[in-house]
């Protein structure tokens, strides 16, 4: 897992006084903004709001691939799959704070919501990672555990992250191949 990138840009969310004005102004510059960003980097990740405002809707409709972060929560999963059917074909799902012994495990989620196994990955719950996030030490946690086989919990966590990254990478390559064919 390459942890440092040559070109990694982050456009932070800011306090927006008037969402309607933001959405209007974003639409005016959206196409130019994304063209510039795509010229600067091979991959472009955009973190959107989970609501259906204009900027989120336009970003999702233009996206080649959408990574959807979910939890093992029956109500949340059902609500998502009932209310967002349009993005399913473009989606790669990540189940965060995953617990394999939970009632809604990976197999059940895939079966219930008709998700092909290659379109879903898990990020297991890990207390040590949670502490690293709290203290701003995620990179150190990952670097320390990337090859470590001593700590069983961290080894399981890293295997699952590796698997999720590999599945996501395959989806990205598939999207790039489809784009090249056009």
Features from the language model and the residues they span:
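P-loop/Walker-type NTP enzyme "switch/lid" segment
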Residues: 1-39
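Short, well-ordered alpha-helix to beta-strand connector turns
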Residues: 5, 41, 62-64, 88, ...
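Conserved beta-strand segments of the P-loop GTPase G domain that flank and frequently precede/overlap
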Residues: 12-13, 45-47, 66-71, 93-97, ...
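P-loop/Walker A phosphate-binding loop and immediately adjacent motor/lid segment at beta-alpha junctions
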Residues: 22-31, 80-102
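Short acidic active-site motifs
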Residues: 33, 55, 76
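Inter-motif core of Ras-like GTPase G domains
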Residues: 50-73
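Beta-strand-loop-alpha "switch" segments that mediate conformational coupling across diverse proteins
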Residues: 99, 104, 108-152
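NTP-binding/hydrolysis catalytic cores, primarily Walker-type P-loop NTPases
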Residues: 139-182
């Amino acid at each position: 897992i390459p942890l440092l990138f040559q070109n990694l840009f982050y456009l932070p969310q800011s306090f927006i006084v008037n969402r309607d004005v933001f959405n209007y102004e974003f639409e005016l510059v959206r196409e130019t903004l994304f063209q510039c960003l795509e010229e600067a980097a091979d991959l472009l990740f955009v973190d959107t709001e989970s609501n259906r405002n204009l900027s989120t809707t336009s970003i999702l409709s233009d996206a080649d691939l959408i990574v959807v972060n979910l939890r093992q929560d029956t109500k949340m999963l059902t609500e998502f799959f009932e209310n967002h059917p349009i993005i399913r074909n473009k989606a790669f799902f990540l189940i965060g704070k995953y617990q394999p012994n939970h009632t809604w495990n990976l197999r059940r989620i895939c079966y219930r919501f008709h998700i092909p196994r290659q379109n879903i990955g898990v990020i297991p719950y890990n207390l040590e990672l949670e502490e690293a996030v709290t203290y701003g030490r995620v990179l150190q946690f990952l670097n320390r555990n990337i090859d470590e086989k001593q700590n069983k919990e961290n080894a399981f966590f890293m295997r699952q992250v590796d698997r999720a990254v590999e599945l996501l990478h395959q989806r990205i390559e598939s999207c790039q191949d489809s784009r090249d064919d056009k």
